[in-house]
Amino acid sequence: PFDLMLCKKQERLAFVTYEGHLLGLDIDDLSYASEERIRLTATDYVVASFTTRADESLLFVTQTGKVVHRESKSLDVAKSATAKGQTLIPPSRLEQGVRFMGAASVRDGDQVVVLDATGRLKILEAGSMTGAGSIAADGLILSIGIIPADSLKRVAS
């Protein structure tokens, strides 16, 4: 899918791939040239892209519900868009079939919506996911989405 996002100066852009790579780019250093691109293997693709700030956390979810949590300040900024990025899924786990199905940058109060293979949606507090280490689902996890805390406040008013 093609996503368009607006961002502010000094934010970081993160790309997360199916095979567990995390590529961080500094917004201020991005080129407008059309030849710049991310290099992936033939079997890999981007499952999530988002902007992140220093006060946010990064959540990554595998198809089996394992949650990987990182502070956004641990995001290494790549020197170029053609860099491979950080490896979050070790090669031994890749051989076992572990893959990322979704990722997001979250703040306190945000909610995470999880879609599983049975078609059910589950809404969880982002903070509870970081401590739990996994999500209980009725089937394999297909995707996740974020409901920002500030949008919940607007709806309530």
Predicted regions and their residues:
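Short, structured "edge-of-domain" segments at secondary-structure transitions
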Residues: 1-157
